[in-house]
Amino acid sequence: MNARAEGCTAAPDPSSRVVRHERGQHEVFCGLTGIVWLHRKIQDAFFLVVGSRTCAHLIQSAAGVMIFAEPRFGTAIMEEKDLAGLTDANDELDRIVTQLIARRPDIKLLFLVGSCPSEVIKLDLSRAALRLSQRFSPAVRVLSYSGSGLETTFTQGEDACLASLVPVLPASTGTEASLLVVGSLADVVEDQFIRLFDGLGIGSVQFFPPRNSGSMPSVGPNTKFLLAQPFLPDTARELEHRGAKRLAAPFPLGVEGTTGWLRAAANAFGVDEALFDKVTQPARVRAERALDKFRKELSGRRLFFFPDSQLEIPLARFLSRELSMELVEVGTPYLHREHLAEELKLLPADAAITEGQDVDLQLDRCREARPDIVVCGLGLANPLEAEGMTTKWAIELVFTPIQGYDQASDLAELFARPLVRRAKLVA
Amino acid sequence: MQLTVWTYEGPPHVGAMRVATGMEQLHYVLHAPQGDTYADLLFTMIERRNKRPPVTYTTFAARDLGKDTAELFMSAARNAYARFKPQAMIVGASCTGSLIQDDPGGLAKSLGFSIPVIPIDLPAYQRKENWGASETFYQLVRAIAGPKAPPPGTKRAERAPGQRAKCNLLGPTALGFRHRDDITEITKLLGQLGIDVNVVAPMGATPADLTRLGEADFNVVLYPEVASQAASWLQRIFHQPFTKTIPIGVSATREFVREVAGLAGVDPEPMLAAASTRLPWYSHSVDSTYLTNKRVFIFGDATHAIASARIASEELGFKVVGLGTYSREFGRDVREAAAKYGVEALITDDYLEVEAKVAELHPELVLGTQMERHIAKRLGVPCAVISAPVHVQDFPARYAPQMGFEGANVIFDTWVHPLMMGLEEHLLAMFKDDFEFKDGALPSHLGTGHAPASAPAVAEVAVALPQSAPVLDGAASEPAPTTPAPTGAVWAPEAEKELLKIPFFVRGKARRNTERFANENGVATITVETLYDAKAHFAR
C-alpha cells in the first residue's frame, strides 16, 4: 500500500521512534469484517461481497448471533464455472445484482466488495460498479472497494469503503470553512460532539460516513477535516485530493485525547481559549471524576496489545497517561506515522511498538512478560485465559461507544472489567 | 455465481480444520491469505476450546504475491514442525491459496520431515465443509492406518473366545453438534453390551491412535457426513463391517443396539430390557395428547434430519409436513425418508429457498439449524435446533447428547419446550380478547411476554409472499402490507373476522386451505360458510 511510503518520509521528530517490524502469521481479520458495523451505520446501503464461500462464512461468523433478521449484506459466491471462464463473470455479477435489487428495492447505495479470490483472478469490480451504476441510476448508486485480506486488515475495510465514497461526495459551494468529522462513530457520540462544536461556535459540522446515503457531506477546498479514527489514510488522501485539509490531532479517546482533538478544531476555526475552556471544562471535570473510580483498579497494571484495529496506540496512550498503566508491548497491524504523530508525541518514550505480527513469536514474548492484561482477538483470548492470563478482547473496542468525554470512563471500565471478574471468581 | 445471505456450511478447509482440531498431535499448515484466521474463533469462541487450533496459516498479503509465496509456505511449514513437533502433519490451501497454485503437498514433501505429511486437496469452489472433513479424515486414515493393512486376500482372524469385542467410533469432530456428549452416551451403551471402544476418531485421537484402527472388530459410524468414506475404506482393506443405523431416537437406538450386538456376537436383549428412557412414557402420558399431528418442518444435515423425522412422526406423533437437507451428498437418503411421510424432500443449500418453503407450508414447529431459527423468528413459528450449523448456545455446559436413551430424553424436552402448553392453547382458542394472553402472544411459559402486535400479520402475509420477504431489518417489525391472496377468491369481511377466531398457529394453514377450496370449487367470495365448508373438507 502506497500510504506507507508517504507516512515514513513525512515523519517528524517525535515519531521517529524505534518500531519493531514483524512479518509472519497474522492472527487478524480481513477488511470484509468492516461490513459488520458499516451496514448498520449507513442504513440504506447494501454490501455485496464478491468472493468465495470462505468470505460468506467469515462475515456470518463475525456477525454471529447479532443478526436474526435479514441482514443488509450478502455474498456472490464464485463457483468453478466462474473461475474456469465458462461464464462471463461480469454477466453473472449483473444477474446477481439485478436479482438483489429486485428483492430489496429500498437499497439506495450498493457496494461491490472485493475479496482475495476476486482480487487474485483480477475481476474488475470498479468497472462493474460503473456499468451497474449507469444501469440502475438514479435509484441506486453502485460503488466498489476491496476488503480482501491481501490488502486490508480489519478496520482498513472501513478506510477502503469511505475512500470509495469520497470521489462521489457533492462539492461544497460556500466560501465559509466547514468541519468534517471522518470515521464511523456511535450515534450517541456524534450527538455529543455536535453539541460541543455548537458550543464552540463551529456551526457547520458534517459527519462521514453519514447515517444514510441521502445525507452525504459536501467537500471542497474550504473543508477542514478531523479524523475520528486512526485507520483512515486512504480516505484522508482522497479528501485531500478534493482540496480538504486535515487537522493534525490526537484521537478523541480519553479526556486528554478528546481535548486535543477538539482543540485542533477550535484552533482551526479561531475559537478563543476562554470560550474553549468554558465549553469543555464541565465535561472534562465530569470525565476526570468518572475516571477516578478506575484509577485504583488499573494503575500500575501491565498491559500487552496484540495487533488488531490500529486503535492500539491511542488506547495505549490513554491507558498509560490517564490511568497509569504500564505498557509492555503495543502491537498494531499498521502504523501511519503522519496521522499518529500527535499520539506518538504523547506515548511514553520507552513504549515498545510493534508493527505487523508473527503470532507465535509475539505469544512467546507475551508469555515471557506475563502482563496483567492482554488485549487480543477472539482466536487468542480463551486460549490465553486458559493459560492463566487476563484478556480483553479487542473487537469490542470497535463496537462500543468509546470516544469523547462522556465515554472515557466506559472505555476504562472495558479494561477494568476482566480484572474485576478474575478477582471475583473463586472457582 | 450464487447469491448467498446465509451459508449452511463453511468452505472445505474448515472441515479439514474440524478434523485437525478434534485430534491431538496433528498439525495443519494452511496456505491462506491474511484474515482466514477468523476460523480460529469458531473453535475458541463457539466451541469455547481452551487451546488455539493446531493450524498454522501462511497469511500471505498482496505484497507477497509479487514474491515467492511458495517459500513463504515452506518456512511456515518448517516453523510449525519445529515448534509444535506433531506426530503427523496435513497441508493444504484455502480457496485463495488454491488459486495461486503453489502445490503445498509437493513443497512439504520436499522438506523431508520425519513424520507423515499428508496433502489434502480440497476443491473450494465445488465442495463444502462436511465434504472437506470427510475427505480429510479419509486421507488421514488411508495414510496412517494403511501401512498396517493385512495383505490382500487374507481373512480377518477370529476373536479369541472370551475376549470382549472392540469397535471404533468414527465421525465425531470439533465443532460437531453435540459430538462431545454423543461419544459419552454411545460409549456407555456399548459398555453395557460388553463391547469396548478401541479408538474414537477423529475427536480425541492422535495419529498414533489411527495406526490402531485395524485392531477393532468393527466400526460404529456415528456421523456418516464425516466418516462413511473412511469406514467404507476400512471395510474394504481391513474387512471391518460398519454400522448403518444412527442411534438418534428410541427406536433407532434399539435398532442400533441390535445391530452392534449382531456385529459383536453378543445378546442385546438383557441390556435392552434393563435400559431406561423416559421419552416413550412422557410421549404416552395424556399431557402429550395435544402434540398429536402438530405440523412440523424439518431441515438440517441428512443424518439429523432423517433421524428427527422418524422421532417426530413415530415417537412424538407429529405430522411431518416438510423434510429437507443441505447435505447434497446424502440427497438420495433424504428423498427416500421424505417419501415415507408423503412429502417431497427439499435438497438445497439456498437459505432463501428454505425460507420460502417454511412460509408456504405454515408449520406449527420448525426443527432445523441456526438458520431456521432466523426463519422461524421472522415468521413467528416455534423452533428447536437439531443440527449444525449452530451457535454458541448449542455447545452447552450441561450433558446434552442427541444419541442413545439419554439423547431421547434431551430431545423430548427440547422439542416440546417452544410449543405453547396445552391448557394455554385451549384457553386462547376460547377467549380471544384477553388483554394479556392475547392472540399471537408468545407462550407465557417462555417468559418474554408478548410478541410484537404485528406478529400475526407477518406470519399470515408470509403465505402470500414466499418470494418477497420483508426488506430492511426494520421492516420485519412493521405491520406487513395486506397483499391480496394469490387466488381469484376474495374474502368477505365477516369471513376475514371469523378467520381471526382460529388459533394463531394454525390460522395461516386455515387461510390457505380455504383459498384452495374456494378456487377448486369456483367460489368467488369467501364467506363464513366457505370457511367452514373448507374446514369440513380438509378435516383430518
UniProtKB/Swiss-Prot annotation, chain A:
InterPro entries: LIPOR_BchN/ChlN, Nase/OxRdtase_comp1, Protochl_reductN. The keyword 4Fe-4S applies. One of its GO terms (molecular function) is 4 iron, 4 sulfur cluster binding. Binds 1 [4Fe-4S] cluster per heterodimer. The cluster is bound at the heterodimer interface by residues from both subunits. Its EC number is 1.3.7.7. It holds the Pfam family Oxidored_nitro. Gene3D superfamilies: Nitrogenase molybdenum iron protein domain (3.40.50.1980). Its cofactor is [4Fe-4S] cluster. Protochlorophyllide reductase is composed of three subunits; BchL, BchN and BchB. Forms a heterotetramer of two BchB and two BchN subunits. Belongs to the BchN/ChlN family. NCBIfam families: DPOR_bchN (TIGR01279), PRK02842.1 (NF002768). Component of the dark-operative protochlorophyllide reductase (DPOR) that uses Mg-ATP and reduced ferredoxin to reduce ring D of protochlorophyllide (Pchlide) to form chlorophyllide a (Chlide). This reaction is light-independent. The NB-protein (BchN-BchB) is the catalytic component of the complex. This is Light-independent protochlorophyllide reductase subunit N. It comes from Rhodopseudomonas palustris (strain BisA53). The lineage of its organism: Bacteria, Pseudomonadati, Pseudomonadota, Alphaproteobacteria, Hyphomicrobiales.
